[in-house]
Amino acid sequence: MRKIAILSFVILAFTFTAFGQKTKPAKTTSAPAATNDQPVRDAFDRLVEGIKQVDAEKVMSVYQNSDRILFFNNNGTATIGWETMKKNREASYANAANVSLDITGLRVEMLGKDAAYITCKWKQQQEYDGKLETASGRMTLVFKLIGKDWKVIHLHTSPDNPDANRPVLTSERERQ
């Protein structure tokens, strides 16, 4: 009986010792690779500045000039092609003034050395045809490194409350 008591005591002592020890995390020899998302952020900032300045040329310079580029628009429609989107921007910017655009929750995710995406919330206020408008929503932009420049290759915007009174451009209408 005495041997069982001693054995139980030893087991109990080892149990307390094992659970009571504090362990230090193992040191790693290599740090995780740092990602440089600043060039992507810079391209995004140029886009935002172009919108605030109501400058279609500046805005479109951030997008890849391709007839295959796809935009999911704020009004629930889709536009295909850089030229078409440029014409749409020029047409709508002719009626816009005093634009303010606030970006919150900006997140840049690098998908490798030549691809990234940005997600954010946006709130825009502007005069459109002389009337004050406010809109807000979420946006995802996919970027690709083309040559030395980061270009948007896809845009998806989702408004919080779409304005049913805003016109849908001919190029934005669904095709049969």
State where each predicted segment sits.
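Bacterial N-terminal signal peptides
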Residues: 7-15
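Positively charged n-region of N-terminal signal peptides that target proteins for export
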Residues: 1-4, 21
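A solvent-exposed, acidic/Ser-Thr-rich amphipathic alpha-helical stretch
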Residues: 56-111, 133
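Hydrophobic/aromatic beta-strand elements that line small-molecule binding cavities or substrate pockets
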Residues: 89-90, 103-109, 122-124, 138-144
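Outer-membrane beta-barrel domain signature
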Residues: 128-130
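A short hydrophobic beta-strand element
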Residues: 114-124
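Short beta-strand edge/turn micro-motifs at domain boundaries
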Residues: 136-164
